[in-house]
Amino acid sequence: MPIDFHLSASQKGTYQAARSLARNLLMPARQTYLQHPPNSPLRFQSTQPTYAAAVSAGILKGQISPAHGGTGGTLIESAILVEECYSVEPSAALTIFATGLGLTPINLAAGPQHAEFLAPFLSGEGSPLASLVFSEPGGVANALEKGAPGFQTTARLEGDEWVINGEKMWATNCAGWDFKGCDLACVVCRDATTPLEEGQDPENKVMIILVTRADLDRNGEGSFEVLRHVATPGHTSVSGPHVRYTNVRVPTKNVLCPAGQGAKVAFGAFDGSAVLVGAMGVGLMRAAFDAALKFAKEDNRGGAVPLLERQAFADLLSGVKIQTEAARALTWKAAHAMENGPGDYDARRELALAAKVFCSEAAVKACTDVINAVGISAYDLQRPFSDLLNTAVVLPIFDGGNVGIRRRHLQQLMLKPTYDAWSSTYGSFP
């Protein structure tokens, strides 16, 4: 395709809808949840009306593939939506987008027999939450290397039921609005029906089981527990607690991915979300730049001219603008490549990983650069700068940490004998 950064009619529509959503729905949500103490679970619960309004507006249905009855568009359109929302109110936005991540394994792997699980998210009613329940308290970065024990959350087949036991952490939305379980959890776990044999690849035991709120209610009190609500410096209206499943029984029909197929689908979900984390980074960089630019035009720090006329300030600010443009270009290229190529899946995936790593780390640097430019006034909580940094700092370490997971995946791609560094740009040639 020719290189053209003009938005299509559909992309312009996405941008306009995202702009309206961010300013008219998400921004007021911030004023609501800030009325509650920092890191209080009430902050998350107070955003339920906002979430319900987003559902009514079709945002959840837009995160489901048309193949499954949704109205989902392209990955570039998703990136436009995420960037716009993150430039205005990232915390309330993450709850919405985390449901999209929770539904991604179904988008990737569901068959007709799984339609019932998607029904609540296609209705446009209520405030259903979905969650990709992946991370564990002890970490999972090395859990699937050969010789490792694999996931500590297990599922054992007993008759026509799977019995789930284990603890999970950081899975956004997994506890639901009342902290008794979300509407749909894609639980990534290890098949423990038979033991992992010495030398066996732990990936061969990874499966994904769908656990609904009805399943948890049927299992009764104590089957699902919130052990701790995690206090975080940013995204303070988001819920991603430490939870425990105890002898949760679900029917065999709830298996989305049997043992041996779960890891591929879970990592496939994170390949798509890598691009969207890139867009999150761009949104935060935008917000940091805009706030610093406004400050520089209005403030002179006791001098004779506005700060923007000072070379030191202008150099820092122009650097942030340049990095923001570069980050967006990489994000859009990765989004386009994931769905259109060129190159094989590994080449496309490399761009998604690069977008996640580059944009997340650039966002942190952008926030610190504008803080250095603004000076001590940036430390005032009435200004947005410290909040932007507290939000940005999680991007390199969540959704697959850059050091422990994302850069290791890049390393694995480069180690392959078939690695072609530039096929995602020029295609493959003999």
Curated annotation (Swiss-Prot):
Keywords, in A-Z order: FAD, Flavoprotein, Nucleotide-binding, Oxidoreductase
InterPro entries: Acyl-CoA_Oxase/DH_mid-dom_sf, AcylCo_DH-like_C, AcylCo_DH/oxidase_C, AcylCoA_DH/ox_N, AcylCoA_DH/ox_N_sf, AcylCoA_DH/oxidase_NM_dom_sf
Protein source organism: Podospora anserina (strain S / ATCC MYA-4624 / DSM 980 / FGSC 10383)
Reaction it catalyzes: a primary nitroalkane + O2 + H2O = an aldehyde + nitrite + H2O2 + H(+); a secondary nitroalkane + O2 + H2O = a ketone + nitrite + H2O2 + H(+)
Record GO terms (molecular function): acyl-CoA dehydrogenase activity; flavin adenine dinucleotide binding; nitroalkane oxidase activity
Active site: D399 (proton acceptor)
Keyword Transferase: no
Quaternary structure and partners: Homotetramer.
Name assigned to this protein: Nitroalkane oxidase
Source organism phylogeny: Eukaryota, Fungi, Dikarya, Ascomycota, Pezizomycotina
EC nos: 1.7.3.1
